[in-house]
UniProtKB/Swiss-Prot annotation:
This is Inhibin beta B chain. InterPro entries: Cystine-knot_cytokine, INHBB_C, TGF-b_C, TGF-b_propeptide, TGF-beta-rel, TGFb_CS. It holds the Pfam family TGFb_propeptide. One of its GO terms (cellular component) is extracellular space. GO terms for biological process: activin receptor signaling pathway; animal organ development; cellular response to insulin stimulus; cellular response to starvation; fat cell differentiation; negative regulation of follicle-stimulating hormone secretion; negative regulation of hepatocyte growth factor production; negative regulation of insulin secretion. The lineage of its organism: Eukaryota, Metazoa, Chordata, Craniata, Vertebrata. Residues 26-276 form a propeptide. The keyword Glycoprotein applies.
Length: 391
C-alpha cells in the first residue's frame, strides 16, 4: 500500500470515528461529477449495480443489528415450542395482547413502529417464564423456572409475581360457606437444603381461577447473585380437605401451567437529541428519512419473535449542502451501526462531506422467545429512525 492510499484509509477511519462520536465533520466540496452520497460513507442509500446482493447484505445487517440490540449472539434455536395454550393464557392474563383466529398474537403497541407519546426514560423489560417440576405431590410441589438474564445486564426488579391456577373439584359445602386455603411458597437454595418462606397467602375461593403471589424480593436476590434458576416449594394447606387442586405441570392442563412474570428496569438512560426532519417523497434530494419495512416472516424469524410482525428499519439519505451542515445527530442508531458497515466497502474514502444521519430515534417494543423458551417483552431504545439531519 503506497503512502497516498494509506493516508486515504486513515482519513476514512478518522471520519468514521468522528461520526460515531456525533461530531460534526467539516464540509468538503465533492469532486466534479459526483454526488454527496458518493463521497460520504454514511450519506444516503446508494443503489448499487447488484441490488439483489446488497439486499441480502442489508437484511443480514438488519439481523445483526436486532440481535445486538437484544444483546444476543445468535437467534434462539427453537427446537420445541412452549405449549401454545400456556403462552396464550399468559399473554391474555397479562393483557399484553389478544390472539387472532389464525393463532397469531396481536399487540397494539407492538406493530413495529414507535409507540405514541413521549419516549420512556426507563425502559422496562417483561419476562414470562413457565414452570417445570421435579416432583408431583398432591399438596407440595417443587417448581423451577429458568429466567432470562437479559444479556447479563444489571437489572432492578420493578415487580415480580407467580401466577398459580387453583381448580375447584366437586365438593359438598354447607350453605353460605366457602373454601379457604393457605398457599405457602418457599425459596429453595439449590446448593443446600435450606429454604425460606417467600410468601404466604390466604385464598378465599368461590370458583376456579388464577391467583398471584408477589415474588419481587426473591427475584431481585436471584439476579444479584447472578443466578438464573429459581427453585420454589409450593404448599397448599387445606387443598385436600376442601377438594382444591392446584394446577402445576400437567400435560392435560397446559393452559393452566404456572408462570412467573418479572418486570425489570435497566439503570442506564440516554437522552435523545431531537430535530424535525424531512420525509423522502421522491421530490427532494435533501437529507430525509426513507422508510424501509422488513417482514419477519420473510427472513424466517417469525418462529421466535412473537410480536411485532416486522421492523421499520428506516434510514437517512440525501444531500447535505453547506448551509445544512453542523446539525448535531446521534450515532447510536440503525443508520450508523448497520448501514455504514457494508456501504463503506465500495466507496472512496478520500474525501468527507457533511452527512445525513439520524437526529431522532425511538423505542421499539418486542415480544420474543429467548434460549430458555422464556417469553420476553422488552422495550428496546434507539431502534427506529424517526428524523434525519446533517452533521
Amino acid at each position: 500500500m503506497d503512502g497516498a492510499a494509506r493516508r486515504g484509509v486513515l482519513a476514512a477511519l478518522l471520519a468514521c470515528g468522528l461520526l460515531l462520536l456525533g461530531a460534526a465533520a467539516t464540509p468538503t466540496p465533492p469532486p466534479a461529477g459526483s454526488s454527496p452520497q458518493d463521497t460520504c460513507t454514511s450519506c444516503g442509500f446508494r443503489r448499487p449495480e447488484e441490488p439483489g446482493k446488497v439486499d441480502g447484505d442489508f437484511l443480514e445487517a438488519v439481523k445483526r443489528h436486532i440481535l445486538s440490540r437484544l444483546q444476543m449472539r445468535d437467534r434462539p434455536n427453537i427446537t420445541h415450542a412452549v405449549p401454545k395454550a400456556a403462552m396464550v393464557t399468559a399473554l391474555r392474563k397479562l393483557h399484553a395482547g389478544k390472539v387472532r383466529e389464525d393463532g397469531r398474537v396481536e399487540i397494539p403497541s407492538l406493530d413495529g413502529q414507535a409507540s405514541a407519546g413521549p419516549p420512556a426514560h426507563d425502559p422496562v423489560s417483561e419476562i414470562i417464564s413457565f414452570a417445570e417440576t421435579d416432583d408431583l405431590a398432591s399438596s407440595r410441589v417443587r417448581l423451577y423456572f429458568f429466567i432470562s438474564n437479559e444479556g447479563n445486564q444489571n437489572l432492578f426488579v420493578v415487580q415480580a409475581s407467580l401466577w398459580l391456577y387453583l381448580k375447584l373439584l366437586p365438593y359438598v359445602l354447607e350453605k353460605g360457606s366457602r373454601r379457604k386455603v393457605r398457599v405457602k411458597v418457599y425459596f429453595q437454595d439449590p446448593d443446600t437444603s435450606n429454604k425460606w418462606n417467600v410468601v404466604e397467602k390466604k385464598v378465599d375461593l368461590k370458583r376456579s381461577g388464577w391467583h398471584t403471589f408477589p415474588m419481587t424480593e426473591a427475584i431481585q436476590a436471584l439476579f444479584e447473585r447472578g443466578e438464573r434458576r429459581l427453585n420454589l416449594d409450593v404448599q397448599c394447606e387445606g387443598c385436600e380437605e376442601y377438594s382444591v387442586l392446584p394446577i402445576y405441570v400437567d400435560p392435560g392442563e397446559e393452559s393452566h401451567r404456572p408462570f412467573l412474570v418479572v418486570q425489570a428496569r435497566l439503570a442506564d438512560n440516554k437522552h435523545r437529541i431531537r430535530k424535525r426532519g424531512l420525509e423522502c417523497d421522491g421530490r427532494t434530494n435533501l437529507c430525509c428519512r426513507q422508510q424501509f419495512y422488513i417482514d419477519f416472516r420473510l427472513i424466517g424469524w417469525n418462529d421466535w419473535i412473537i410480536a411485532p410482525s416486522g421492523y421499520y428499519g428506516n434510514y437517512c439519505e440525501g444531500s447535505c449542502p453547506a448551509y445544512l451542515a453542523g446539525v448535531p445527530g446521534s450515532a447510536s442508531s440503525f443508520h450508523t451501526a448497520v448501514v455504514n458497515q457494508y456501504r463503506m466497502r465500495g466507496l472512496n474514502p478520500g474525501t468527507v462531506n457533511s452527512c445525513c444521519i439520524p437526529t431522532k430515534l425511538s423505542t421499539m417494543s418486542m415480544l420474543y422467545f429467548d434460549d430458555e423458551y422464556n417469553i420476553v417483552k422488552r422495550d428496546v431504545p434507539n431502534m427506529i429512525v424517526e428524523e434525519c439531519g446533517c452533521a
